């Protein structure tokens, strides 16, 4: 059985439970994915299944990639590898749908966070900034001291400073599957998922599933 599937984040909404409670959910279009390659221990040193997801125009695909996808019989925009418990159960060209998950199951979602550009320490690291009065004029959102003087005579590594924020690989763990729509290839997940709308996400079984 495959450990995960590729998809895209559609957006967020809310649904009502039988008790009338509202639950914030993220709508993810998970699959359908096609198996584009099988990784074997003899050839690659490990076992995995390469999945393809998304549509793309043929003129935008290079000829080497077209040759790679010829056996799958379909051109795809994204390709990622996922773990599997039984490699022999899959063949190149097989279609993987969202039915590999069940309602109530815990999952992990990997996505790329929204890029925020160059950000200061208040926005990037949550610094409180300097005092608003008592002679302050241009240091309200400044970081303050970044180190000593002659000793050590340099700025330590990993010092929290201003810089580019976001556009990073982010993993959110132990999200609950609330609803599955097999016809629309849609899965509803409780809570938020990293990334912007239409962003690529990897949905996989929880690596550290917690039991209630």
Curated annotation (Swiss-Prot):
Entry keyword set: Ribonucleoprotein, Ribosomal protein, RNA-binding, rRNA-binding
Disordered: annotated span: 127-153
Pfam families listed in its UniProt record: Ribosomal_L3
Signal sequence segment: none
GO cellular component: cytosolic large ribosomal subunit
Family assignment from sequence similarity: Belongs to the universal ribosomal protein uL3 family.
HAMAP family named among the record's database cross-references: Ribosomal_uL3_B (MF_01325_B)
Protein name: Large ribosomal subunit protein uL3
Taxonomic source organism: Herpetosiphon aurantiacus (strain ATCC 23779 / DSM 785 / 114-95)
